[in-house]
Each structure stands twice: as C-alpha cells, then as structure tokens.
C-alpha cells in the first residue's frame, strides 16, 4: 500500500528516472519543498519551477488592475515552467497544484513524461474528489436538471 508520493518514487525507480522536476503553484511551495526533500533523501536529483517564475505583471499586458486582486498581480507562466524543466533535462515532472488550464499547458510543453501529485482545489483542501463524495448531499444541486 503506497501513498501517491510513494507511487511516484516507485514509478521513477522502475523507469530508471534520476532527475525529477517539480512544477509548483506558489501557494503550495511549502508542500513542494517537503516533497523535494523526500525525493532527495531517496536518491533523486530535484529541479523546481514555481508558477510565478519571471515575475511578469498582468497589468503589463493590459489586464485592468481591478481584475488582479484574486490571485495577485504577477502572472503564472506554466509554459516557462515546462521550458525550465526541459532545460534541466528532467526525466519525470511532477505537478503540484497548478491551476486548471495551467496544468494542461505545462503537460503540453513538457518534454518529460509528467504526473500530478496535488490537484488544486482551494475549497476542498486540494481534494477535488470530495465534491464527488458529496454528490448525493451537499453537491446534489450539481446533478439537478
């Protein structure tokens, strides 16, 4: 019986992967640091790329400042995250909490095979399946015609 962390390490070992990339949301940086430490303790080389890499402001491309308050003024750059990990020649990339769409762009541009450790869900403590578990109760409204 393995946790997702164990499964990722076992998969990497069986595939002969040595270099692991972590593409992380800034909101989950502490979790990514813990994951990186675990990977290093288990013999992997770890490379990281945070979503806000490059620090490019949303207002610089014409986004009105009133629309930047939800996630901040600095843009996420999942394609740049992928390119940085490509440059490091990672064998396996692991996504930690990238937003919907940003994760898709990361997967598209990553040259290495990629998997997910954490799926972002700010409401359900990063456990999106919780909504499905509550489909007959709290989320019943989602199934109504």
Where are these regions (language model features)?
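Active-site glycine-rich loop that binds ribose-phosphate moieties when present
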Residues: 3, 72-87, 98-100
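Gly/Ser/Thr-rich loops at beta-strand to alpha-helix junctions
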Residues: 2, 24-32, 54, 96-104
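Short, acidic/small-residue loops that bind anionic groups at enzyme active sites
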Residues: 45-52, 109-127
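Electropositive, gly/pro-rich neighborhoods at or near active sites that engage anionic ligands
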Residues: 1-19, 26-30
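Long, charge-dense
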Residues: 31, 35-81
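C-terminal functional extensions of proteins
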Residues: 115-145
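Short Gly/Thr/Asp-enriched flexible loops that form oxyanion-binding sites at enzyme active sites
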Residues: 31-38, 103-112
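Conserved beta-strand elements of the Class I
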Residues: 21-23, 92
């Amino acid at each position: 019986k393995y946790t997702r962390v164990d499964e990722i390490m076992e998969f990497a070992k069986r595939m002969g992967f040595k270099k692991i990339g972590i593409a992380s949301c800034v909101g989950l940086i502490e979790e990514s640091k813990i994951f990186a430490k675990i990977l290093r303790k288990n013999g992997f080389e770890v490379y990281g790329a945070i979503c806000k890499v490059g620090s490019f402001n949303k207002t610089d491309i014409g986004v009105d400042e009133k629309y930047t308050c939800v996630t901040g003024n600095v843009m996420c750059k999942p394609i740049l995250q992928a390119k940085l990990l490509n440059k490091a020649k990672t064998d396996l990339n692991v996504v930690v909490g990238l937003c919907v769409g940003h994760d898709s762009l990361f997967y598209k541009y990553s040259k290495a095979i990629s998997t997910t450790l954490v799926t972002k869900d700010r409401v359900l403590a990063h456990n999106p399946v919780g909504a499905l578990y509550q489909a007959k109760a709290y989320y019943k409204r989602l199934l109504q015609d």
